[in-house]
């Protein structure tokens, strides 16, 4: 309006808006922050210790490139034992990849609620279909804070070990070789590799000890 030669004050704008029944929808920074905190609540807050299996699951996706192709690896760990309870390898980083991995974990573990599922803010985990899936199972969704990888450091550590101990050490001849190597490493990780957080027990041994103790009680 100023460019067209009109002069108008803030008060005049307010009066015109009142007369027309209009209201401002501007949100201040605190409102936006509070809304984000409610939408992406972090229930873990870097507390990575639990008292039983199926209390908290953590998940993430990484990718590995060979033969000019990206392969995406989605993994879910049980925070109690650090056991890999489900994983899938896909050629596309998609919501379907994370959905099918979660469904595999749920069918295998048949967890007793409450269960918290923690991830970063990747778009697949934020998607409406994925959030509805978790809600349909009664699972509480927890998110890392934006750009804070330490909020999901258990998964960061797992993928670092996977790449350092297996993927970066081998030149795969085919997709089949690569997938077999991932399968083999997961078995090794769960059944043979001691974990410091488990008192140097393997993830499987940590869970078996828990189950045996519960059977005695």
Q: At which residue positions do the language-model features occur?
A:
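C-terminal domain-tail junction helix/linker
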Residues: 128, 135-139, 161-217
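An active-site-proximal beta-strand-loop segment
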Residues: 50-85, 91-92
